[in-house]
Structure formats: C-alpha cells, structure tokens
UniProtKB/Swiss-Prot annotation:
Gene transcribed to yield this protein: Slc8a3
SMART domains with a match to the protein in the record: Calx_beta
Extracellular side: 31-73, 169, 223-230, 749-755, 801-829, 883-904
Gene3D superfamilies: 2.60.40.2030, NCX, central ion-binding region
Domain comment (free text): The cytoplasmic Calx-beta domains bind the regulatory Ca(2+). The first Calx-beta domain can bind up to four Ca(2+) ions. The second domain can bind another two Ca(2+) ions that are essential for calcium-regulated ion exchange.
Keyword presence, Glycoprotein: yes
Cell compartment(s), UniProt: Cell membrane; Perikaryon; Cell projection, Dendrite; Cell projection, Dendritic spine
Protein name: Sodium/calcium exchanger 3
Membrane topology note: Multi-pass membrane protein
Lineage start: Eukaryota, Metazoa, Chordata, Craniata, Vertebrata
Major location category of this protein: membrane
C-alpha cells in the first residue's frame, strides 16, 4: 500500500508540527510571565507552568546535569524525540504479535453435539468467542494496550500517586480516534462511494457507553468527591466494563427488548454474521438495514437463494474468465486457488487483521494475504449449503449439490450430482431429470438428456452426465438448466399376516424435492484464434549459453493459421554481433499449433557483464485462413455501409475471436556473467516465504520471518497472489526495524497454548516498552518545559494512535462496511476509561484506603479535557448519524464536497480540543 510507505515520514512531520505548536504556546507563556501578567486568578505559577526539573522515571533515570546549556538541551530534545518515535515503532511491532495471538484466541472453535427431535445427533463446530465480545475485550485491549498499561504503570510506579500522563493520554487518544481517524476514513473513500456501519445497534450501544464513560469520569472528579477518588468510584468504573460488554452482546444477539423489534435479517449460523435482506430505502435514516418509521407492508419479495445463486454464478464466471485471460497457461486447480485469493482479498476482514497488515507492510514484512491463499482455497470450496427446515422426520430431501456448474466447451461432458438427505436411506429412491434450454440450445451446444437417477439403499448421492458439443464457432458463454422431478421411493410388498390397519399406522418412507432442484450449467467457450505471449516478461541468461531458445505460446484457442511478427530491440546490450545477433521475422502458427521457438545467438566475449539487457517484442498477429464472411465483416470497407442487426452481432463476435497479444508481448533478456537453472526453485521458495500468516507455528519460522525482506504493495496490484520484488522503502524499513523484529521473534509462537502464551508474553513486553515511553515522554516534556498533561494529549496519544489510523484507513478502503474502520473506535474509547483509568485508580484507591488515607486526583485539567471531549463527541456522532440519510448514503465517503466538509469539521474539532486543553493547562483560560 503506497500510503503505508509515508507513515514514518508523516508521523515525523506531524510530530514536528505539534512540537512547533506547543513551543509557540510556551513562548507566549514565557512572554506573559516576563511581563508580570497572571494568566488566571486563583492559580499559582507552579500549576500553570511546565516544570523544567525532570523527575526520576519508572525505569529511566534523570539525565544529569539537570540544568544543561541551550545546546545540550536541544540535543537532549532530539534524542528524546527520536527515541520516542523508535519506541512507538517497537510497540507497533510487538502489538502485531499481540494482535496475532488475539486473532488465534478469538478464532478458536469447539465441537457441540446437537440432538434432533427424531433422536438423531450430529456434531458441529461453533466459535467460542462472540464477535462483539471479542471486539470489546481482547481486540480493544490489543489496540489500546499502551494507553491502558501506561495509566496503570504510572500510578503503580510512582508510589500510587495520581499522574497526568496516563489519564491525559487516554482522553487525548480518544479525541484522536474520534476526530482524526474517523475524519481520515471519511475522506479516503473514492468520490461517490459510501461505507456504512452494518451493526448499527451495537455501534449505538458502544457510542453511548463511550460518552457516558467520560461523563462518569467528570462526575467522580468534580461532583461526587471533588479531588478524591474513593474505592467505590474506582471499582464501579471498572465494573462498567463488563456491563458495557454485556449490553453490546445483548444488542448483537437481539435479546431482551430487541427480540420484540422487527427483524429484517437472515442469520448465517455458520459464519456468525448478520446479512441484510431488504434493499428498498425509503426516505429517512437507515438503522440496521431498516428505515425508521417504515413497515413491512407485503410479503412479496425475491427469494434470497435465487439471488445469491445467480450473483455467485456471475461472479465466479467473471473471476475465472479474467484469471484465465491473464494466465492462460494455468491449470484449473491453480485458477481455483487464484480465484480464492481474489475472493479473500475482497472479503470483509476484522480490525485486528488490518492492524497486523498495516504494521507488517510498513516494516517490510510483506502481504499476509498471500500466505492464506492456499488455505482459503480449500476452506471456501464448501460454502454452498442449504439451510432449510426439515419437512418431516421421515421425509428424504433430494436436490442438486452444488447447483451451479461450469465447464469448457471441449470438456466432452459435465457431471452433475444429486444428493438425498434425511429420511430412511435404506430404501431405493428414483428421481427423474431433464435438460432445458437457456441461452444454450440442445443439439447445438449440448446433448439433450433425460433419464432417471436411481439411489440404491445406503447411497446418498449419485452422478449423471450431460454431453457438451464442441464447435469451431467463437461465441459468448451460454448456459442451460437441468431440472429434477417425480421423486419417489420403492415401496416394499405387504408382509404376510400384516393387517392393513397396522400397515397404515407405520410411517412410510417418503421423499420430497428440496431447493435447489434446478441446476445451472454454464458453458465457457474456448473457440478462439489464440492469445500469443511469452512465458514471462523477464529472463536471465548466461553469456556462455551460445544460442538461446525463446518459446512463444499460443493459448486460449488454436483455430486457424496465424502469423506473428517479431524483432529484437537493443537496450544496454548491443546487437550486430557485439552482445547478441539481431533477429527478426515472422512466426507462422498452423491450425492447432500452440508453440513456436525463436533462436537468438548470444555472444560470449569473456567480459564481466551484469544486467546488460535487450528486448524481444511481438507485433500484432494476423489471420491467414479467415473465412470469407468473417473477412468481409472485419474489412475496412464494411464500415461504409450500415450493417444489419445480425451482421453487427456477427461482427462483434468475430472481433472477439481475433488473435491478440497476451500478458507478455515483450520479453526482456538480461545477460549475466553466469546462469543457473534455479528460477523455478526460487519462485517456489518465494511463494513459501510470502506465506506470511497471522499466526506462527515455530520459533524458527518467526526468526526466518524477522530477517526476511518481503514486498509490501497493494493487494489489488497482483490479484494472482504472486510475488513482486521488495522496493527500496521495504529494505529501508526492514533495516530500521530489524532489531525489534528479531527481538520479538523470541515471543512464543501463537500455536503454543492456543495463543495464550504469546498473549501473556506480548502484553508484558508492551508494558515494559510503555513504561519506557512514559519516562521518555515525561523527560521530553520537562526538557522543553511542557506539562505532562500537554505531552500526553499531544505526543503520546498521537504516537499510540498512528498504527490504528493506518489500519482504519486500509479497512475503510477495502471493506464494504464501516464497522472495521470506525465501528470499534467508540468501543475502544469506553474500554480505555473503564480498564485504563478504572483499574489504575481502583488499585491506588484500595492502597491508600488500606493506609487509612484518601487517593487524591487533581480535577482541573483532566476534568476540563473530559468535558471538552464529551461536547465534541456529541457533535461528531450527530454528524455521523445524519450522514446515514439516503442522499448521503453512509458514515464514510459520499460526494466530494460533503466529504471535505465532514473531514474539515472533525479535524477542526481535534485542533480545537488540543488548543483549548493546552490553553487551560497553562491557565490562559479558566478550567474547573
């Protein structure tokens, strides 16, 4: 991702701007102090000015001497600033491991046994963690661990005395998340596109708790017991965390009062997600796929199964055709794997994934999607499953599985599978089938077929074939249908001595047709004059090779005779016998001929030549034995007269069947001093090395990953999942971060203890780094005369939130919905208060209560920041809610003017928050 490459520079420039801003305020404060003006009555100079006397940190000692000269002070500021950025980078990398362990933990499944009403039992797997619960607990902890641990470490490390750094970082981080991250996500969506929150009820619950958390923080600071945090206040703050999680879970599961509300969702039990079922949007504000004040007036709607099957079929054909066009040499299994990679790269992902992806691509660790391509290809192959209620206990359901089939025109025949499910499988069952025309016609495109499938006792599925007719005419893809009918069960003869009454009381085995009972077969046409291409775009040869052979491939059809001109073009390697012999001419491909070879002599002059290159290029191919009708349709003279509709269609199809150049019309030949046949092995190794999974299996894998440079780049740059070379930026960032990557490779792999070992060790390391960051930030602030509250709000909050910013931006661009990009912002803000401040203050309040004293917390600056943030958060959430109206379409994106206005508003709110919080800290405006 190109924007990720600017992350360190962007972070540095923004930090520099913030430093300049705060130093400007310091100059104003110093000028006011020199003139004898008192900024605010009733407040002493010590509380209104930043102290230049640094205090001992939790880990870092004081840098002596304490009163350095101006030059030494500038040097110290630079050292502290660079160290802060480097420590933030280290926290991002260990947070990558931490989030990977959370992904492993939250994706765990367990087996459950389900007992059906008829007494049968079946075993299935379900996710242990609910998505909403994991987002508000482990996911929030993973993204906010530095802020939470900083608050706890600051209190415990300074003798259980309240500090400004931890709480101010939490409030400042909340402001940055709410205003800057959401503002960026609004802006980066392409003009005219929108993203909306899907689970709006959960978002409302977390947003309400987010605002309540900061209102509650103000109440315990300035209302209940001003300046003192009592034990019950700290414990109640901490107790609000599980209450928030519980209510969000209730909203997600639609329990309590939610179950009485109108449901317009279909729940996918297998994936645990909610899918909207209605697309009509009347005027108003949309909420969870339902318009407010709207009602379901009638029951006439298109069945979901039909829509999904049709859309899935079209999407599958489009992906396979595109991939086959780009990679005609690939076999079907490779195309399926590439298609699965494409689907994986475009599906909705968790916030943890984007956080890990952003960090790894920023640090030269590569694209983790390329690791999952093979595994996802297997997992996604069994996604078509019909969920219908059992008609009766003793009825067998008969249907196609799958219901969509694709085949090439020259395949000969296509196999279709009929499945029976449930009922008594000890009986023989019969079901008739018959082909029906679609855009494909029986006798011309396929063989008309009808017959009866016999499922013998114990058989649950049976295959039958339909012949496909191959012709020499290039035509568009066509489809036909196969319909099941007249399902029946072979009944046994009446047993001797059995009374009719007894026979009638027995539940006779019966069978019914279930959906889908109609299969769609799509014929992918392969009649084409051919696509002509080299095997690759670059080849390395040794100068001692003598005569090199270059293959020209003819793929995706081999109809007719085609001539392909070619020539060599000089680069740094010169022709005419200096480095190679010039070559030019024409290749003539006969009918059904698929490969031709170009021979070029390479001159061996015994010189050390590295990266000398030249190019072999093909020109436009032309048909030789074109039919008269096709030649007339494609001739220039035909444009002088108006064609009939039939001639226009025939001309269009003829144009599509013309020979064309493929993916590699040019071949760059690089002449080196030596050449070894290892390109295939290298590609295989690179593919293996690119398999960067979120989880790790061994320490060896982690250390290999830590010292390996892999290419970043956008997922859309290479839909096949194949490797490109690392850029200069990838190498630079790798060498800058290799210390952290090797150090954190010592963390236990995520496979150990189901991720919990990695979880515990990672959070301990994050805590240690956070303690160092707190000391660096405090020493940085005191060196330039900043208060801890200002340093926390401006610098620490910014540094801890930068990785989340880039992760949210990636999620906003790549996800269909806005949940992964901004849906978790409000939840994280609430968790920061309940865990970060609640835990730290509970520990401190209990400690001082055991000493018979009270835990004192200064309410001034923190209470003012909390109040200011709460007001601005109301404005932000109101704007987001208004943006769900139909003329805007969603929280993110929209028309360019609306995007700019929203982004500028949110950024302005953050700048105003920073300005007012800083002015209040230095007593330029009166706080509480």
């Amino acid at each position: 991702m190109a924007w990720l490459r600017l992350q360190p520079l962007t972070s540095a420039f923004l930090h520099f701007g913030l430093v300049t801003f705060v130093l400007f305020l310091n100059c104003l404060r110093a000028e006011a102090g020199d003139s004898g003006d008192v900024p605010s009555a009733g407040q002493n100079n010590e509380s209104c000015s930043g102290s230049s006397d640094c205090k001992e940190g939790v880990i870092l000692p004081i840098w002596y001497p304490e009163n350095p000269s101006l030059g030494d002070k500038i040097a110290r500021v630079i050292v502290y600033f660079v160290a802060l950025i480097y420590m933030f980078l280290g926290v991002s990398i260990i947070a990558d491991r931490f989030m990977a362990s959370i992904e492993v933990i939250t994706s765990q499944e367990r087996e459950v046994t389900i007992k059906k009403p008829n007494g049968e039992t079946s075993t299935t797997t379900i996710r242990v963690w609910n998505e909403t619960v994991s987002n508000l607990t482990l996911m929030a902890l993973g993204s906010s661990a530095p802020e939470i641990l900083l608050s706890l470490i600051e209190v415990c490390g300074h003798g259980f005395i309240a500090g400004d750094l931890g709480p101010s970082t939490i409030v400042g981080s909340a402001a940055f998340n709410m205003f800057i991250i959401i503002g960026i996500c609004v802006y980066v969506i392409p003009d005219g596109e929108t993203r909306k929150i899907k689970h709006l009820r959960v978002f409302f619950v977390t947003a309400a708790w987010s605002i309540f958390a900061y209102i509650w923080l103000y109440m315990i600071l300035a209302v209940f017991s001003p300046g003192v945090v009592q034990v019950w206040e700290g414990l109640l703050t901490l107790f609000f965390f599980p209450v928030c999680v519980l209510l969000a879970w209730v909203a997600d599961k639609r329990l309590l009062f939610y179950k009485y509300m109108h449901k317009k969702y279909r729940t996918d039990k297998h994936r645990g997600i909610i899918i909207e079922t209605e697309g009509d949007h009347p005027k108003g504000i949309e909420m969870d796929g339902k318009m407010m004040n709207s009602h379901f007036l009638d029951g006439n709607f298109t069945p979901l199964e039909g829509k999904e099957v049709d859309e899935s079929r079209r999407e599958m054909i489009r992906i396979l055709k595109d991939l086959k066009q780009k990679h005609p040499e690939k076999d079907l299994d490779q195309l399926v794997e590439m298609a699965n990679y494409y689907a994986l790269s475009h599906q909705q992902k968790s916030r943890a994934f984007y956080r890990i992806q952003a960090t790894r691509m920023m640090t030269g660790a590569g694209n983790i999607l390329k690791k999952h391509a093979a595994e996802q290809a297997k997992k996604t192959s069994s996604m078509s499953e019909v969920h219908t209620d059992e008609p009766e206990d003793f009825a067998s359901k008969v249907f196609f599985d799958p219901c969509s089939y694709q085949c090439l025109e020259n395949c000969g025949a296509v196999l279709l599978t009929v499945v029976r499910k449930g009922g008594d499988i000890s009986k023989t069952m019969y079901v008739d089938y018959k082909t029906e025309d679609g855009s494909a016609n029986a006798g011309a495109d396929y063989e008309f077929t009808e017959g009866t499938v016999v499922l013998k006792p114990g058989e649950t599925q049976k295959e039958f074939s339909v012949g496909i007719i191959d012709d020499d005419i290039f035509e568009e893809d066509e489809h036909f249908f196969v319909r099941l009918s007249n399902v029946r069960v072979e009944e046994e003869q009446l047993a001797e001595g059995m009374l009719p009454a007894i026979l009638n009381s027995l539940p006779l085995p019966r069978a019914v047709l279930a959906s889908p009972c109609v299969a769609t077969v799509t014929i992918l046409d392969d009649d084409h004059a051919g696509i002509f291409t080299f095997e690759c775009d670059t080849i390395h040869v040794s100068e001692s090779i003598g005569v090199m052979e270059v293959k020209v491939l003819r793929t995706s059809g081999a109809r007719g005779t085609v001539i392909v001109p070619f020539r060599t073009v000089e680069g740094t390697a010169k022709g005419g016998g200096e480095d190679f012999e010039d070559a030019y001419g024409e290749l003539e491909f006969k009918n059904d001929e698929t490969v031709k070879t170009i021979h070029i002599k390479v001159i061996d002059d015994k010189a050390y030549e590295k990266n000398k290159n030249y190019v072999i290029e093909m020109m436009g191919p032309r048909m030789v034995d074109m039919s008269v009708q096709k030649a007339l349709l494609l001739s220039p003279e035909v444009t002088d007269r108006k064609l009939t509709v039939e001639e226009e269609e025939a001309k269009r199809i003829a144009e599509m069947g013309k020979p064309v150049l493929g993916e590699h019309p040019k071949l760059e030949v690089i002449i080196e001093e030596s050449y070894e046949f290892k390109s295939t092995v290298d590609k295989l190794i690179k593919k293996t090395n690119l398999a960067l999974v979120v989880g790790t299996h061994s320490w060896r894998d982690q250390f290999m990953e830590a010292i390996t440079v892999s290419a970043g780049g956008d997922e859309d740059e290479d839909e096949s999942g194949e490797e490109r070379l690392p850029s200069c930026f990838d190498y630079v960032m790798h060498f800058l971060t290799v210390f952290w990557k090797v150090l954190f490779a010592c963390v236990p792999p995520t496979e150990y203890c189901h991720g919990w070992a990695c979880f515990v060790v990672s959070i301990l390391i994050i805590g240690m780094l956070t303690a160092i960051i707190g000391d660096l930030a405090s020493h940085f602030g005191c060196t330039i005369g900043l208060k801890d509250s200002v340093t926390a709000v401006v610098f620490v909050a910014f540094g801890t939130s930068v990785p989340d910013t880039f992760a949210s931006k990636a999620a906003a661009l790549q996800d269909v919905y806005a949940d992964a990009s901004i849906g978790n912002v409000t939840g994280s803000n609430a968790v920061n208060v309940f865990l970060g401040i609640g835990l730290a203050w509970s520990v401190a309040a209990i400690y001082w209560a055991m000493q018979g004293q009270e835990f004192h917390v200064s309410a001034g600056t923190l209470a003012f920041s909390v109040t200011l943030f709460t007001i601005f958060a109301f404005v932000c959430l109101s704007v987001l809610l208004y943006r769900r109206r139909p003329h805007l379409g969603g929280e993110l994106g929209g028309p360019r003017g609306c995007k700019l206005a929203t982004t500028w508003l949110f950024v302005s709110l953050w700048l105003l928050y920073i300005l007012f919080a800083t002015l209040e800290a230095y007593c330029y405006i009166k706080g509480f």
